[in-house]
Amino acid sequence: MANKKRSASSSRWLQEHFSDKYVQQAKKKGFRSRAWFKLEEIQQSDNIFKPGMTVVDLGAAPGGWSQYVVQQLGNKGRIIACDLLPMDPIVGVDFLQGDFRDELVLKALLDRVGDNKVQVVMSDMAPNMSGTPAVDIPRSMYLVELALDMCRDVLAPGGSFIVKVFQGEGFDEYLGQIRSLFTKVKVRKPDASRSRSREVYIVATGRKL
């Protein structure tokens, strides 16, 4: 019965995925994922990315966010990206493949950032979902806590943080942590985010000194 349930759920997800207008548009326009449209909407609302910035992209593969941001930064901008999964090269993106939770990978990522602070940290990280919120939410919260730690390490005063978070236990406390570190915090649900998904995007600007 469980296998049949999973099979039905998987079939429904595939049907929804391939009929999704954002998936179709991404494929038609040569974008790497529908996440491109989520970040475009955030940029239109919050004007985060500007030419010449340095940006850290966590959970970068397959590259939809990096692909969008590299267009906003111009030739003098820089993106340092990391993901457990491989990602095809993008001009202007320094990609590190590895598990962000691993201390050696984190050190390698910090080495690539160097001594200069960055203007934006963005995270689209998510755990492998089991379909059980009691399991998935804590795993997700662990990842977003690590992303916030990255902000504390490398984000310049006045910098911005964009992070995907799944609503559930721990969300309000996490939002409170972000509000203590930034002057302006918004919770966004882009049109390209599926309505039945728990995911939202916290957009925080003006990192406090």
Curated annotation (Swiss-Prot):
Specifically methylates the uridine in position 2552 of 23S rRNA at the 2'-O position of the ribose in the fully assembled 50S ribosomal subunit. This is Ribosomal RNA large subunit methyltransferase E. Keywords: Cytoplasm, Methyltransferase, rRNA processing, S-adenosyl-L-methionine, Transferase. It holds the Pfam family FtsJ. The active site is at K164 (proton acceptor). It catalyses: uridine(2552) in 23S rRNA + S-adenosyl-L-methionine = 2'-O-methyluridine(2552) in 23S rRNA + S-adenosyl-L-homocysteine + H(+). Its main location: cytoplasm. The keyword Methyltransferase applies. InterPro entries: RNA_methyltr_RlmE, RNA_MeTrfase_FtsJ_dom, rRNA-MeTfrase_E, rRNA_MeTrfase_gammaproteobac, SAM-dependent_MTases_sf. One of its GO terms (molecular function) is rRNA (uridine-2'-O-)-methyltransferase activity. Belongs to the class I-like SAM-binding methyltransferase superfamily. RNA methyltransferase RlmE family. Its EC number is 2.1.1.166. PANTHER family: RIBOSOMAL RNA METHYLTRANSFERASE, RRNA METHYLTRANSFERASE 2, MITOCHONDRIAL. NCBIfam families: PRK11188.1, rrmJ. HAMAP family: RNA_methyltr_E. SUPFAM superfamilies: S-adenosyl-L-methionine-dependent methyltransferases. The keyword Transferase applies. S-adenosyl-L-methionine binds at G63, W65, D83, D99, D124. Gene3D superfamilies: Vaccinia Virus protein VP39 (3.40.50.150). It comes from Proteus mirabilis (strain HI4320). It is found in: Cytoplasm.
